[in-house]
Amino acid sequence: MPIEGGKTDMERIGLFSEMEYITVGDKYVSPFNRPFNEAASKNRQILPGGTKEMSSLQAGYFDSQFARIFEGEGYVNLNQVRRRYMLAESKKNLGKAFIPSSGEKKPSGLGSYYGTIGGPVPFFSAQIKPKDKYQPPGKNLYTNPGKKGTGYGYANVTIGKQLSHSSDLYDAARQSYKKESEEHHRLIKGSPFKLHLHPKDYFDTNPYFLEHHLPPLRREEKKEVSFKPFKPSSPGKKAGGMKAGAFDPYPAHSADPYVVKVEKAIPSKGERVFHPPNGPKSRPVESIMALNVKRALNVKNYKNASSTTLGKQLVF
């Protein structure tokens, strides 16, 4: 049986069925003596049915005979059908319309005053109330005539009075400065104060002068520098995965696999997909029309060839 969705080897080659093996001593079996249903003779009864083809026969239907829908029916009047339906519905009425014993209930929702203490208030009624005729009020009193502008082009239109013009001296600043300097010189008494002693600086002229002597200098001892090559304490490590000179020891062998293989889940008998056994393959059959007309045209008989000798069909 092939894999899921695969083909057999014979189907890949393109043959209808595998050729039969002829052995010495086997009897000849005529095709007329072969069973009609070869699969049934080999105990292969569970075979799926093939696809249904559309035809005018009754073989593919449940009923053995085609039944017409409106066979033997008379003309139907739609108005008569409606009247019969209305009459049948009217018979379902038992009597008069049902009236409850307690009467109709009044609503007590928004806009209803049923169940309240005072009832509706006439002030909040939605009816239009009569109103007096509207009389517009009179004009306001004028205490001062209107202004003629913003004040840029008109005189005496602001709240305050108009500023009067006053002329200033050309060199008023120089004259005021002159008066202040004369008053300052008047307050100065005599020449500046001068000391008769020899002047001295605040600090000594020698910036390195010290009262106490400094201690003697200490010379640092110089270490002798050795130019010997550096030698490591242990030999060099060898590359290539060798652990002889490494810091860590060689890891111990472990039987754990590097990658854990995921085992394939083997489905049980009930979970497997049912594949019916393949039926018998068809064999290549020659046409009956060409059995008696096969003739060959070769080098020897091509001169004497005719339609009577070769038949209607010539095979090259």
Swiss-Prot record:
Keywords carried by this UniProt record: Cytoplasm, Cytoskeleton
Gene Ontology CC: one annotated term: centrosome
Region span, Disordered: 220-242
Primary localisation category: cytoplasm
Protein origin, superkingdom: Eukaryota
One Pfam assignment: CFAP96-like
Record-linked InterPro entries: CFAP96 (IPR029358)
Biased amino acid composition, Low complexity: 227-237
Localization (cell): Cytoplasm, Cytoskeleton, Microtubule organizing center, Centrosome
Keyword flag Ligase: no
Family: Belongs to the CFAP96 family.
This protein's name: Cilia-and flagella-associated protein 96
Species the sequence originates in: Mus musculus (Mouse)
